[in-house]
Amino acid sequence: MNDLDSLRQEAERLKNTIRDARKNALDTTLVQATAGMDPIGRIQMRTRRTLRGHLAKIYAMHWGSDSRNLVSASQDGKLIVWDSYTTNKVHAIPLRSSWVMTCAYAPSGSYVACGGLDNICSIYSLKTREGNVRVSRELPGHTGYLSCCRFVDDNQIVTSSGDMTCALWDIETGQQCTQFTGHTGDVMSLSLSPNMRTFTSGACDASAKLWDIRDGMCRQTFPGHESDINAVTFFPNGHAFATGSDDATCRLFDIRADQELAMYSHDNIICGITSVAFSKSGKLLLAGYDDFNCNVWDSMRTERAGVLAGHDNRVSCLGVTEDGMAVATGSWDSFLKIWN
């Protein structure tokens, strides 16, 4: 037996030891702990606004921190900033590359970012003196497509990429400050913790990881999914996060318990999940699916509480406002819908 085989066996043994230790530490399950809770009841949301203007598939959206404006990115090569109250377009930004996969709104509202198959994260300034929108910085450095980006503040942004890494950038200098390596597949999504000190990532190696932004270390790895993880989102209190995967399940992982707490699945659901988001309280988990629907889950009882049906194609992205008052879904049908 060669060294490689013995190392593989050793790694497998260690994995099993960790799995068993996690199991032994589990004194109750979420379903048992919440059995006495009242069910939420049926959640029925209506479409309040439809944002029309993109001419092709929408791939990504992100709410601004004012809970009014949002940015969306489409295959039509446009980044549009919308006023969700009036449905007006505040900015329509033509992109150099139309192969865009992600977009982000800075917490200050002064910048938006996007990227995709060009491997570059482009930062656009919305608050120029001339009143026009222009590229304020391009961040090249990833050797694979840009799958997700999120601003820490106006001068720092975290990106995830198909090159199996994530990166923290200094926007002013355009330099990569930290590279986060450890995934063994394309990193598809990231989510910043509420305190902005850590972030989680989901990847095509079917694992999620928790990273420390300050020192670049992987703090924890969460296995469990059986296929690519397409989406991750933090629980509002920062102690847990949810994932959505091509294995047709969403899962809830607890950071302090270091393991999976819950799985959200149904025999009738056989398609992958593209996007996930929590309500402000964390009581609801919203998930967008390849079958054109968005399911609403009771996050504590792991039961389906409702469905948002209104798109004519895959729901590719969704987000809940910071004030918790509305949900936006974006779809390959080229429309964004605002629900509450």
Curated annotation (Swiss-Prot):
Coiled coil: none annotated. WD repeats lie at residues 53-83, 95-125, 141-170, 182-212, 224-254, 268-298, 310-340. Keywords: Repeat, Transducer, WD repeat. Disulfide bonds: none annotated. Gene3D superfamilies: YVTN repeat-like/Quinoprotein amine dehydrogenase. One of its GO terms (biological process) is signal transduction. The keyword DNA repair does not apply. CDD domains: WD40. It holds the Pfam family WD40_Gbeta. It comes from the Eukaryota. G proteins are composed of 3 units, alpha, beta and gamma. Belongs to the WD repeat G protein beta family. PANTHER family: GUANINE NUCLEOTIDE-BINDING PROTEIN BETA G PROTEIN BETA (PTHR19850). Guanine nucleotide-binding proteins (G proteins) are involved as a modulator or transducer in various transmembrane signaling systems. The beta and gamma chains are required for the GTPase activity, for replacement of GDP by GTP, and for G protein-effector interaction. This is Guanine nucleotide-binding protein G(I)/G(S)/G(T) subunit beta-1. It comes from Homarus americanus. The gene is GBETA1.
